Amino acid sequence: MTDMWKTEGMAAVGAPMDRVEGRLKVTGGARYSAEMPVANVQHAVIVQSTVANARITSIDTATAEKLPGVVRVLTHHNMPKLSPQAGKPPASRFLTLLQDDIVYYNGQPIALVIADTLEHATDAAHRVTAKYASARPVTDMRASNRVSYAPESNGRKPDSTKGSVSAGLADADVRIAATYTTPIENHNPMEPHATIAAWEGDKLTVYDATQYVIGDRNTVAKTLGLSPDDVRLVSYFIGGGFGCKGSVWSHVPLAAMAAREIGKPVKLVLTRRQMYGPVGARPETEQKITLGAKRDGTLTAVRHDSVSHTSRFEDFLEPSAMQTRMLYASPNIETSHRLVKLDLGTPTYQRAPGEATGTFALESAMDELAEALHMDPLALRLKNYAEVDPDSGKPWSSKSLRECYRTGSERFGWSKRSATPGSMRDGDVAIGYGMATATYPTNRQKASALVRLTGDGRGGVRALVQTASQDIGTGTYTVMTQVAADALGLSVEQVRVEIGDSRMPPSPVSGGSMTAASTGSAIDVVCRQARSELAAQGVTDLTSMGAYLDRQPDRSLTVRADSAPGEDARKYSMHSFGAVFVEVRVDRELGEIRVPRVVASYGAGRILNAKTAHSQLIGGVVWGLGMALEEETLVDPRTARYMNADLAEYHVPVNADVGTLDLSFVEEHDPYVNPIGVKGIGEIGITGVAAAIANAVYNATGVRVRDLPITLDKVMEKTRV
């Protein structure tokens, strides 16, 4: 037998292992929330408002209620009242729907139809009519009469001041100031939001497509006035989330309340169009960057002022200026965040919230400063490389950004770039090179896990690991299997990981790129603790391990443990970094922009699975391409209606839009970040990409586009070449 304690080489961790649930998914065996086998389930369909900023004066459900198969139609007139705690922080006021006649945004649920089939429920929903007393909605964040305000701090202060930017600008030889905008963007996961709610007495089971099993359970319990112990939340497989499934939206408690009202399970699945408005989006931003520098490129002043929109009824802040506080060394850095209320649904987190939008502005401005200084953009960034965190003054737990710059620039061929806009051509096609810095914080929260080692009666051993985490398509099942196998000294074939059930030990949200760091650390800790307990009993190898377990009354050993950030989290600043280089080709006659290649290099700590990690980078970079060139949610200013609320008119990149992606990691060892040395890579891939493309478009055409997306009309309107 293999020595149980021999972990040199760590064959399980780091290997490009295929997804353990892959066969289930491709054969249809993986059951998503809408597919869970629940007997006698009834179907619910939401009726949405057609206006915003209004009150319902009347709502007619009589015709719908008479249709075949209709069980109930719920409105604010007959919906049971929620718990007084519903909608209070940290929960959203989105959850208090069908409680009164107020309509905040177009598409807000105003009724819920329950019927025996989806077809019957859909037909009846179309027969519900409402009348409103409405005022013209406010949808333009950049209106001249807008009122902006500083949101209350929820852990991160909206404003920051280091030194004096005014003094730094006075000391500068070169100054630039520019305003950059990003539009509303929607998540568009392949799987829409879906919920099945089933009661058994006073106990509630909810199958929901969620990024946060424990948080979802707690919010549902609070909203309905239940104990969390009386709510079971299950989410075994999720078809993408990207942030919109990290919060509980109104459809979840609506399904639960409907099920309680009719005494039968209720299934509620949103349509694609219903994914626009009721479940959040990335908010619009307007960001002003002011930079000052000496002739040699030394930054003397950095200012980043960001404004984003929120809903009329609650605050959500897009923290676009956060990375500006820590990315470049300068004695004078000031940032601010302001909100503007609009008659739209509340925005929410979307892949790299803050950093995705913020790096577009900051990294575009850095290139504009480089142009004003007649300096290479990469050289400017290296000139202002931050050896410590400029915001906190703390040392980095690790930082490999210099190596990322070197590796990325060499693989890309950055030295061949011509600094003169429009000078690189291939016939009627203008070629441009651009680059940007990528960054994302390393987040970690407390997590718990359980391991049960079982003997098979013949000296063999199997391990079951449980934690209430969730796999949103990132490979959590697979990576956690590798972590457990490595910590136990077992093969991956001997390990089974179970997640997605609130009855398991709690884990945090799958967001903020923290699952590997949080849940992975908990699994590593509990498995090593189990190994230590076995060692105390004289177990020295797999043979003695199996024999020991076979002698136990139930042939097993069960251990549960927690893992949480410690003192190192207070001593060090923890971030992932990367460098993105892109080539664009712009048709000089048509303005069409193509991105034939992206080369990017990242330093993100220990890589747990080379294949899933590379997959995450591909996804992030493709998201960056969409952000730069295609994605924009359009709102009708007259009605506040989303005008392109489907995948036909909301444009996202397809295979034909994506060129060669050369994405790599530099080796990075971080002994301080967490027990397994990982930083998380789910979001860094999108950061910097939009700016690199904008910078490349300028290099190709001489046109500086500061308003995303960069569409051909914006290029043709100002083209100089």
What are these model-predicted stretches?
Residues 1-154, 175-178, 251, 261:
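Flexible, low-hydrophobicity surface segments
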Residues 84-88, 124-127, 217-219, 242-248, ...:
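Short acidic, glycine/serine/threonine-rich loops at helix termini
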Residues 116, 264-311, 524-544:
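Phosphate/diphosphate-binding loops
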Residues 146-224, 385-462, 641-665:
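Helix-loop-helix junctions that connect adjacent transmembrane helices in secondary transporters/permeases
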Residues 20-24, 126-137, 211, 218, ...:
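Extended active-site and interfacial segments that coordinate phosphate-rich ligands
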Residues 15, 21-27, 88-89, 156-195, ...:
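Glycine-rich loop/linker segments at domain edges
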